[in-house]
Design a protein with these regions (language model features):
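Active-site proximal loop and beta-alpha junction motif in alpha/beta enzyme cores
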Residues: 1-78, 85-140
């Protein structure tokens, strides 16, 4: 799907990439309090409906992101729509000129490719590995 509505907020970008995402750059991402700050923004800034909250740090080659995911109400190892929002937000704000952006998540590295369009972005693709991290059975 295309992403058309990108809103610049103070120190952040907001967009819907299939679900709502707040993208905010931070320093020292590895020590950042994602749960505490994510929960505060998810409810405080976006109310009951909320938003996923992505904290981003620029790397030498791409970006690193940690995401507080609504519904899960905690940090997750990877969020595809969040990584996509990060790549588009970093392009929109001029932090990268690349249209194939590597994004490091806690669960690995994803690559987001896209084309800039008059009102946003189109032909958006996410690639990355998939690994089984859990298997279980539930008796009904």
């Amino acid at each position: 799907a295309n992403v058309d509505a990108i809103k610049e907020k103070e120190n952040a970008i907001f967009m819907d990439t299939g679900s709502p995402h707040h993208v905010q750059t931070v320093n020292d991402l590895s020590n950042f309090e994602v749960f505490k700050e994510g929960k505060k923004l998810r409810y405080g800034l976006y109310g009951a409906s909320g938003s996923n909250i992505n904290f981003v740090e620029q790397l030498e080659n791409g970006f690193a992101v940690r995401t507080y995911e609504r519904g899960v109400e905690d940090e997750t190892l990877s969020c595809g729509t969040g990584a996509t929002a990060v790549a588009l937000a970093m392009h929109k704000t001029g932090k990268t000129a690349l249209t194939k952006v590597p994004v490091k998540v806690e669960g690995g590295v994803l690559e987001i490719s896209f084309e800039a369009a008059a009102s946003g972005y189109k032909n958006i693709f996410l690639t990355g590995s998939a690994q089984q991290v859990f298997k279980g059975e539930i008796k009904i």
